[in-house]
Amino acid sequence: MSLFLKPFLFLYDTTLSLLLLLFNGWSLEDTAAAQKRREADKNAAETEWIQLQYLWTKTRSVVLLPVFKGLVVMCLVLSIIVFFESFYMNFVILFVKLFKRKPHKVYKWEAMQEDVEVGPDNYPMVLIQIPMYNEKEVFQLSIAAICSLVWPSSRLVVQVVDDSTDPAVREGVDVEIAKWQSQGINIRCERRDNRNGYKAGAMKEALTQSYVKQCDFVAVFDADFQPEPDYLIRAVPFLVHNPDVALVQARWIFVNANKCLMTRMQEMSLNYHFKVEQESGSTRHAFFGFNGTAGVWRISAMEAAGGWKSRTTVEDMDLAVRVGLHGWKFVYLNDLTVRNELPSKFKAYRFQQHRWSCGPANLFRKMTMEIIFNKRVSIWKKFYVIYSFFFVRKVAVHFLTFFFYCIIVPTSVFFPEIHIPSWSTIYVPSLISIFHTLATPRSFYLVIFWVLFENVMAMHRTKGTCIGLLEGGRVNEWVVTEKLGDALKSKLLSRVVQRKSCYQRVNSKEVMVGVYILGCALYGLIYGHTWLHFYLFLQATAFFVSGFGFVGT
């Protein structure tokens, strides 16, 4: 029976298979045709892939490579420009130190003394403005320091320009003013019912008060600045004895520089700005940008140049450029220091850097033609203001730092045909970094961290610069930099230590750039033949640390 069972089962399976094929609409001819179609589709796909490869190769060689090469050349040119600008300024500082070209030797300076007959009336009338806006943590320190300045009380007017909208802050300011008035200080508070023009608008309106007309000079101190008692004694004589001097600017020092690593980085950058940029400008050209605070102005020079204007968010720089174009001289005093506080929160620092980069770029856009057609100053000074002061320091350095070191250099791993010379990626940035750290010797060991952090911040500065040049949507955005009042930190400890959630700490832009640089680093590690991936891994880490909120307090 088994002899008949096996053939039967074979026939049964074969018949069932054929029925299933027929039931699904298949046939032996269809199966063969399907095989041919699959082969044809495969060949077509291979052909399309070859065509895509050819198209990509052609696009890469004809479009992408030339464009990328052009961007590299542009960045190399900017590297040379920025390097020589930094070298020039440091050379000027070396000259100042070797030949001891202090302001006291260049300009006339004599100590102010009371006249035997008229008493303190031979002292000029000085107005001190303290602009503030809801800065409850720091205003007491500033008012106390300013009311303690050594100057005849009959020749001094302290003006608190309070734009605060918080009733508690207003009340606190009133209490502080009443306290000092009871001690014989001529201190007043000026308020308005709007915030038109922000800081510039407030100070401009305050200068229209009748009692200001008797004043010769005006000193400006932001709400977190604490001058030493001898500030006016040391600064005002330059204005009294040199009628062509319009501004005397002091150097900032920082009470919370050791708060965290971010404040140490800020100290390095700002020390370079004051000790190198400001002093070289003062020495070589008698011109620099007013820092908005810790300076004394000649009121007549301000008025001749049009006074405060609120057309940009850098009203201080705007005023300085206009006064400088009228032929006035500026004096920077490196040994006269004023204490103040650095922003210790990353968000506050980002807002500050946006304003400090957007405002100058926008002012550059607005004033270029005005500078070119100015007839009061020399061609050399106009060239210095346009090229060195604005283009190199306010535009080129930001574009170079971000686009070259965070975009072009990482992307170069995909274009091995293009060689980026080592002088532009190693020697030039190393020398520029050394120039910067010389202004803060105690932080020399932090130079690597400073470079990586500056590259991260260059993203925000470049964005702000583009908005300023193009007059984008945030061009006139004004956000008061938040300060924690470190001198009062014991009172604020419970508020400062509050932790943000993980989601609130994430900064998406930094994370996205970090992901891109990390991808370039991995590609360079696997396929590259250069050392770049070492730098790229470090830079990606810096973006991730900032992106996930592990910067600042």
Curated annotation (Swiss-Prot):
The chain crosses the membrane at residues 64-84, 395-415, 431-451, 510-530, 531-551. It comes from the Eukaryota. One of its GO terms (biological process) is cell wall organization. SUPFAM superfamilies: Nucleotide-diphospho-sugar transferases (SSF53448). It is found in: Golgi apparatus membrane. It is a multi-pass membrane protein. GO terms for cellular component: Golgi apparatus; Golgi membrane. GO terms for molecular function: glucomannan 4-beta-mannosyltransferase activity; mannan synthase activity. Keywords: Cell wall biogenesis/degradation, Glycosyltransferase, Golgi apparatus, Membrane, Transferase, Transmembrane, Transmembrane helix. Its EC number is 2.4.1.32. Substrate binds at residues 222, 224. InterPro entries: Glyco_trans_2-like, Nucleotide-diphossugar_trans. Probable mannan synthase which consists of a 4-beta-mannosyltransferase activity on mannan using GDP-mannose. The beta-1,4-mannan product is the backbone for galactomannan synthesis by galactomannan galactosyltransferase. Galactomannan is a noncellulosic polysaccharides of plant cell wall. This is Probable glucomannan 4-beta-mannosyltransferase 1. It comes from Arabidopsis thaliana (Mouse-ear cress).
